[in-house]
C-alpha cells in the first residue's frame, strides 16, 4: 500500500484528470447535477495520539507521530461529550439532488470550516457545474460567505446564528397589524419586497436591500425550507464515505497521504455512481 501511494502521488496530475473526467461523465448523465450544492465539513481523527503528555504523568512529547494533524472540534457533538478530536477535517461540496461530491478538500482540524466555503464553490464552478443555490448550516453564517455567494450569482441558503444583543436595523418591518409578509424579490436590484398583512399601512409595501439577515430567498418562506432540507445530502455522503468506502478510520499519516486517501474513496463513489447510471441506460 505504501509503494502504491508513493507512485500514485507522483502521478497526481493524471489522477486529478481522472477525477475530472468521471465528474464530466456524470454531469452528462445528470443535467441538473450541481444546481443545488450543500457544503459542510466532517472530522477525520488521525491515526496518531494527540495527547501532549504520555500516560501516568510521563514527560512531554517532543513530536507527534502525525505532525500535520491538529486539535479540532466536532460541531455536531457537545464539548461535554468529548467534542474535541485530533486529526483532520474533510470539507466537501455535494450535489443536493444526487448526493455526489462535486469538490472537496482535506485540511488540518484546527481550521474553521467557513474558510473553505467559497474556495469549494469556486472549485465546483471550475469543474463545469453551475450552482444556483449553496446550502450551509449556521457555522457558515457570515457576511463574507453571504456576499461571496452573491458575487458568484449563487443564492446562499444559510441558517442564521441567533446572536445575543445583535443589532437589527434592517429586520423585517412590523406594524400594529403584525409582521409584514414577503411579497417577492428583485434579483437585479438585490432587494426583497415586504407588504403589510392588512394593506392598511402607507406605503403598503417596502423594499429592503438583501443582506445576510434578509437574503433574496428569505428564511421565512416555504422555498427556503425546502431548499435547506437538501443540506442532509452532504451528511448522508459523509456517512457513506466513512461506513461503506473506508474514509474512516484512517490508517495513514500526513496531510498528503490523508488527502490521497480521501481522493481514492471519493473516486470509488463517483465511479460506482457512473457505472450504475450506465447500467440503467443499457437496460432501458
Which residue ranges define each predicted feature?
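Positions that flank functional sites
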Residues: 164
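Alpha-helix-centered segments that form part of catalytic cores
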Residues: 69-88, 195, 200-228
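Charged alpha-helix within mobile-element recombinases
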Residues: 20-25, 188, 192, 228-230, ...
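Basic, amphipathic alpha-helical segments enriched in Lys/Arg and hydrophobic/aromatic residues
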Residues: 216-284
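Polybasic low-complexity intrinsically disordered regions
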Residues: 1-151, 157-161, 263
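A glycine-rich, aromatic-flanked flexible loop/lid motif
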Residues: 93, 208-209, 237-241
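Generic structural signal of hydrophobic/aromatic residues within well-ordered alpha-helices
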Residues: 4, 15-18, 22, 26, ...
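Cys/His-rich short segments
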Residues: 167-215
